UniProtKB/Swiss-Prot annotation:
Disulfide bonds join 59-71, 74-87, 77-95. One of its GO terms (biological process) is positive regulation of T cell migration. Activates NF-kappa-B in a tumor necrosis factor receptor (TNFR)-associated factor 6 (TRAF6)-dependent manner, causing the up-regulation of the chemokine CCL22. Interacts with host TRIM23; this interaction causes auto-ubiquitination of TRAF6, leading to NF-kappaB activation. The keyword Isomerase does not apply. It is found in: Membrane. The gene is UL144. TNFR-Cys repeats lie at residues 58-95. The keyword Membrane applies. Residues 1-20 form the signal peptide. Gene3D superfamilies: Tumor Necrosis Factor Receptor, subunit A, domain 2 (2.10.50.10). This is Membrane glycoprotein UL144.
Length: 176
């Protein structure tokens, strides 16, 4: 009886994973809802529902958006640093040590150390989409569930009780 209870629990978990919404490219997932995103420099103050839209609030001066729900205080460069970029409602302050020299090319900030005569590069890696991860996880859990169900049915039909009471058990047992 325990394998049957475990199988039912596993099925309920699998159904819950299947109910998870996958939002469109122009939406963000807030809780269990797919909502339109807030504008630049705004944070979510109330999640949307099926009947209401998301409520957004601009971050106050001296803060920037950090995630979907938070405004974080801007960093203040200390005396050993120079400010490269001011804090805005969408980005934190960028500070760097004073012993570096800076130069700009169109749209790109570079810095070069005086002592080592080389350019430092910042690499930004694009994350994998959560949708692909969720799809593979759901498929894996589904396949494990099917395998467990098959093993449970084989064990049930091979048991002596099933062979004595069920004619289909006898037929199934002979074919294995």
């Amino acid at each position: 009886m325990k394998p049957l209870v475990m199988l039912i629990c596993f099925g309920v978990i699998l159904l819950q994973l299947g109910v998870t919404k996958v939002c469109q490219h122009n939406e963000v997932q807030l809780g269990n809802e797919c909502c339109p995103p807030c504008g630049l420099g705004q944070r979510v103050t109330k999640v949307c529902t099926e009947r209401t839209s998301v409520t957004c609030t601009p971050c106050p001066n001296g803060t920037y958006v950090s995630g979907l729900y938070n405004c974080t205080d801007c960093t203040q460069c200390n005396v050993t640093q120079v400010m490269i970029r001011n804090c805005t409602s969408t980005n934190n302050t960028v500070c760097a040590p004073k012993n570096h020299t800076y130069f700009s090319t169109p749209g790109v900030q570079h810095h070069k150390q005086r002592q080592q005569n080389h350019t430092a590069h910042i690499t930004v890696k694009q994350g994998k989409s959560g949708r692909h991860t969720l799809a593979w996880l759901s498929l894996f859990i589904f396949l494990v569930g099917i395998i467990l169900l098959i093993l449970y049915l084989i064990a049930a039909y091979r048991s002596e009780r099933c062979q004595q009471c069920c004619s289909i058990g006898k037929i199934f047992y002979r074919t294995l």
